[in-house]
From Swiss-Prot:
Belongs to the acetyltransferase family. MshD subfamily. The gene is mshD. One of its GO terms (molecular function) is protein-N-terminal-alanine acetyltransferase activity. This is Mycothiol acetyltransferase. HAMAP family: MshD. The lineage of its organism: Bacteria, Bacillati, Actinomycetota, Actinomycetes, Mycobacteriales. It comes from Rhodococcus erythropolis (strain PR4 / NBRC 100887).
Length: 299
């Protein structure tokens, strides 16, 4: 099966089952949340399926980039079909289909992924860190809202336009988080994990209709050896409101909410080269848990 813009229902079910098997076997998901949405037909992507007879044994997904951002790919091989050259064929298909500079994610960047990248003469070009922190100890700092700022939680679709404005201004540089449309908000508010009480928003007292920043939390269902986990899902600050401590206070508001829901651990993702954010999160007690690495062909 060659590249396709959408998966037939039967293939999508097989790919989803393959992702589940690989997640259970490896202890980590081989594709992102965005990738899962695309498999289910809720996001634009190109799909490539490797078959053994009628059985899906390999899968690659290619997300188109832009003039500023490269194409991004994810791939997975059935745990029972590895070391047969399937991964090499999937990677070749990705680099043949993608634009120059296409990148492939290695979620967890385990030794096998590092060796696989070396065998294809790929180089690491982007590092995404997952940080974690227990919510019970050390004690969370108190929430101190800056003077002249009001915080509240999500009220519904009436808030969406401001969330989109701030998100896209704050993440204009980001290949996945930037460029959101209403569809991205609708997908997430329709998810079973969404709780409007866990989406925190900050406004100036003098301008209560203009959003300064937001923190969208998420709760992950138990998976593998992991219990239910909280996540600092998105923290977005309007560039015009930077430097007022809003990122810290919004992050803490979400962490207090997750703790009060009875969760024991919170996670977040941050770019490996974002030293300012890393410093902020480390001061809040976060430690590095694992690394996702993106690889590309050497120039």
């Amino acid at each position: 099966m060659g590249w396709t813009d959408s998966l037939p229902a039967g293939s999508a079910e097989q790919v989803s089952a393959l992702l589940d098997r690989a997640t259970e076997f490896d202890g980590k998901a081989p594709v992102s949340e965005q990738g899962r949405h695309a498999v289910a037909g809720r996001g634009a992507a190109r799909h490539f399926v490797e078959l053994d007879g009628d059985t899906v044994v390999g899968y690659a997904q290619l997300q188109a980039g832009s003039d500023e951002h490269p194409d991004m790919a994810e791939l997975v091989v059935d745990p029972q079909a590895r070391r047969r050259g399937i991964g090499t064929r999937l990677a070749a298909a990705v680099f043949d289909e993608g634009r120059p500079g296409t990148r492939v994610w290695a979620h967890g960047n385990v030794d096998a992924a590092v060796e696989f990248a070396k065998s294809l003469d790929l180089v690491s070009v982007r590092e995404l860190l997952q940080l974690r922190r227990p919510l019970d100890a050390p004690q969370l700092p108190e929430i101190v809202v800056p003077e002249g700022v009001t915080m509240r939680t999500y009220r519904g679709p009436e808030d969406d336009s401001e969330i989109l404005r701030v998100n896209n201004a704050a993440f204009s540089w980001h290949p996945e988080q930037g460029g959101w449309t209403q569809a991205e908000i609708d997908e997430r508010t329709a998810e079973g994990w969404f709780d409007p009480a866990g989406l925190f928003m900050a406004f100036a007292d003098t301008d209560p209709d203009t959003l300064l920043g937001f923190h969208w939390t998420k709760v992950h269902a138990p998976e593998g050896d992991d219990p239910e986990l909280g996540e600092v899902y998105v923290v977005g600050i309007d560039p015009a409101a930077q430097g007022r401590g809003l990122g810290r206070v919004l992050t803490l508001a979400g962490m207090h909410y997750l703790r009060d829901r009875g969760l024991g651990t919170v996670l977040l993702y941050v770019e490996g080269d974002n030293t300012a954010a890393l410093h902020t999160y480390e001061r809040l007690g976060f430690d590095r848990f694992h690394v996702d690495m993106a690889y590309a062909r050497a120039l």
